Amino acid sequence: LLKAIGGECAGALEISPRCEPTLNAVPPRYQPVTDEQLTQWSVGTPQAFSNVTGQGEVRLSLAGVQDKLPVYIDDDQIFIPVAGSPSTHILKFASSFYSHLPENEAFMALLAKSVGLPVVDVHMRATPKARIAVIQRYDRVLQDGVYGRIHQEDFCQALGISPSSKYEKEGGPSLKQCAELIRRRAAFPLLDLNKLLQWAIFNWLTGNADAHGKNLSFLYSQSGAPSLAPFYDLVCTRNYKNLSRVLAMQIGGTTDPDLIGSQHLEVMAADLKVRPKLVLDVAEALLEKIAGALEGVSAKYLELYGDSPILERIPLVIRRQLRRARSQWS
């Protein structure tokens, strides 16, 4: 498995057989992608793009529920990295199980950015038959005209927890463990603790029950000091009736988003070792910001990408969640 996918991993890790030279090409090499290929991949399966170079050199190494592909983009042209060359973006294709999932992620990224969360850049790209989410990689940086890798590790990796146990109820990271990890490791722990708090509350208020330990990462600077990476994989999972609404991480001792009230936020404050007033203030401020931003974000999405069923459904789901939160506080 590592031989097949190790050339272009998340972060700066590169894995190749001991007897072979490094896969990293100098200079990097890329193969252009045609519109026909993009259309084929957008409606196909992983097998549709598993050997796109014809030489077995393309290496898919990005985990998740969607079909996705690391690519290099230059002047809006998409290329496939060859022989371990760095990618710059990730393409996420439509899911056969969850309708309009790329659009969902693009909308939620716009919403998160509008209320002040640090979030990856996500935009939509259309093919004749589908829409694709294009996510800019935060672990790639342009240096002297060439893209290089910045190392990252998600919180399951940082805590030595198997990705198969990424949910707290299965032994995955809790918010308390994440906060303790930040205090031990982060270059600026107070700044990153505040980001963690906002991330957890935003996910609760916007109906994202899939905010688990692999959706938080450290990004390492050249000095080796880690900081919390921009947030990614923000999705309104409550938009899908067949998905569990149970939170991936407890908030104040409960995983039921409909029961969370001020008493749970006070327990959350104790878990994070911050003042209860800070947590309550952040929660109230985010609730008001999200409520006030939904209409503008919907208009912005419509302007950028055109109409989509998510523009009616997701704001409705989020407004219901905000009303439930208000009722618990009152």
Model-derived segments and spans:
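Phosphate/dinucleotide-binding and metal-coordinating scaffold of catalytic cores
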Residues: 1-330
